[in-house]
Amino acid sequence: MSTGFLSPRQPWQGRRVVLGVTGSIAAYKAIAIARSLTSLGAAVDTVLTDGARQFVSAISFEGVTGRDSATELFSVDKSALHISLGVEADVVCVAPATADFIARSSQGRANDLLSTTLLATKAPIVICPAMNTNMYTHPQTQRNLKYLSENLSYTVAGPAKGALAYGESEGMGRMLEPDEIIEEIGKALVGSSPLKDKVVLVTAGPTQESIDPVRFISNRSSGRMGFSIAQAAHRLGASVRLVTGPVALPDPYGVDTIRVNSAHEMHVSVSEWLPQADVSIFGAAVSDYGFENIATNKMKRSEKKGPFILDLMENPDIALETKNERKAKSITVGFALETESLLGNARDKLERKQFDFIVANRADEEDAGFDSENNRVTLLFPDGRCEEVPLMSKHLVSEIIMGHILELLKDRP
């Protein structure tokens, strides 16, 4: 068994990010963006406009990044900061971007450090608008955004609909949340990928099999592994459809999420999307058994004498029964959760269900798997290879899984 594994690397790690902040009430969110990027391993250089400093201070960003914030076009030693920032950046993100800054950027204005940095860089640029609804929907703003996107190839991320500044009603113009902007930056850093515009289907979470209107049987799957995979696939440019059982996780940003309850509902949804999928990842912990006759009313203990017996029926094996519905030359990945004979049982599933590889892990590990942010897995391949992946976050495990999928895509047109 191989103990070497495909080294995971999230797109932000070791990269240089220039984070521009302009004068919007949403500027306070940029501090959280800078903190998260730094924790993900990025070197973050912040550039604050005069307007931004009316809302946030440079010292706040320096405190979370450990790096100086820039505000003036020229540094103390008279070096041209806009040149050095632009040349050294792997990505430039402006969050928030006001209507005024968007207008000046579309015209190629260069009257402050941030606008000149945009002109000096060859790195991808992400613009995150934040403004009043009327300002956002104004035809001139829409023309400016369209020009940035279509003519300059900037990524315009957002805005979203939500609460705006005090005294304003809810509307379109709210800046994306920090974690969503982090994903947009990650996507920009990835750039071109074999998964770009491919359709990826992911199943995640448990299923619930109803006994009566208030009771059900299920399992302890949190859905974190599947959600992390879906987000990683989206970051690589894929069109992702996530079919998930009941979990306490928000929909992953940019992912088409379909929520179901039972194994039957998941089966129906998978059958609908599978023929279109270039990559299918069966990560859900589907209940093996359900109930043929679900009580229409709550079962009461007072109405039953003696033992309470429930008749179980076998649920369909979704990955096996939809095998012939897979798109030609598509890639299929399975999961195997076991309490014994991990490799033997996983190998059996790999062969019976004709997966391109399978991700196996034990159900009885306290520091991994169920109810944990981490996982320890073994990847098994049809040619007999086994790859042990040591304990790491599920986000990093998802990067390893996607790395193997990218390798497989190289050999499939």
Task: Annotate the PLM regions.
Residues 1-126, 132-337, 341-413:
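A cross-family phosphate/adenosyl-ligand binding-site feature
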